[in-house]
Amino acid sequence: MIQLTKFNPPTLEENLRPVGLTDDTMAQRRQELLDKMTQDNFDCLIIYADLEHGSNFEYLTGFLPRFEEALLVLHKDGKAYLVLGNENLNKADKARLKAEAVHMPHLSLPNQPMNTQETVEEILSQCDLEHTQKIGLVGWKNFTSTKEDNYQLFDLPHFLVHAVQSLCPKAILENATRLFIGENGVRTTNNANEFAHYEFGAALAGRCMLNAMNQIELGKSEMEVARELSDLGQAHNVVTIMATGERFVKANIYPNDKVIKKGDKLSLTTGYKGGLQSRGGYAVSQVSDLPDEEKDYLSAVAKPYFNAVKTWLEAIKIGMQGQELYNKIEEVLPQEKYGWTLNPGHLSADEEWMSSPVYPQSTESIGSGMLFQIDIIPSVSGYGGVSCESGIFLADAQLRQEIKEAYPDIWGRVQERRAYIQNELGITLRDEILPTSSATAYLRPFMLDKTLAFTVK
């Protein structure tokens, strides 16, 4: 039974430190992608990046082009070219793979110097593309339409696609993002080093969320609370949310100076590489503080939702098909009644939502090394929302041992989180479930009472 009771909140984790990706990890990434290219008969990949859509590029290069655009051209023999704008050209020799720099000022900011007499096509000709027979274009989206040829949907800027088509008129062009984030894509699983790398951001998001929830008080502004949702100078991978009362007034999506009032609906979100934390509830401390027409919020929305989170955590396991997890959530939280529409769980990495093996009729296998977000979003008419979106990592016995040996401090944090979730929240976890933050599954629906949270009795 789901109960709202008083107990100690999770520990605020200190001494969080970033873990860099090793040279061995970067070499492994490159080789696994080259193997995928061979399997699918690609002569080369052209991988696009901008700040928001650059994770496939960053996966191999180690950096994002910030305010510019960029291309990585990777041939099946391992030869690589970095096509860069004015202010990223100096990053080529800093990249995590050996690549020849090619300057394309067209990728720079508007009105910056265009000191070239060459067209986009002529610049791309420096990347040894003319004799390729099959080219994979990689943006950020693995299309899954049932009505179109997904291999012919390209999410790169037209000026680049057009130049490739003109330069290589006889080549087959395909969307190849699937090699990265589709079923069995190279980015869908992580080694011990990658887990440690991503755990830092996920843990930081959890700490930020716990600190922010502790700052919620009547009369405080959204901005005052939102100050806690950023930390250590780290870049967010989602828009920070701290909203009280009605949302999206005059289309605003950012925290502002609106103050918290009793009975307000509250929404908070923060995220970094490796994981996001989101919370939804009310600015109340007890049922009697809720608006009259919403006094059954706990039984109508919040408790069924938390039961779905419990079910998700207790059901997910290595080797199950995505549809099995999807059906479990549909069983305990029917879409028709609770209004959720998206995948109840997705993979995370540098970006908050990378892809998802969890969907109707999915035969994709959930595997060791997958970094998951518990993302279930009910929408019940007449009530505010509820959320405790957070993350876990799946690791088989061998991967767990590798993490324990290489990163004992992180392993210790993980064990403390597991103990809290099982002993305080009452949720049973398989050995393969590694919570990525101390806030995972912790939910205070009445946010003015900082001692009340859901548990399973």
Describe each PLM feature range:
Residues 1-457:
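Active-site neighborhoods and metal-handling regions in enzymes and metal-associated proteins
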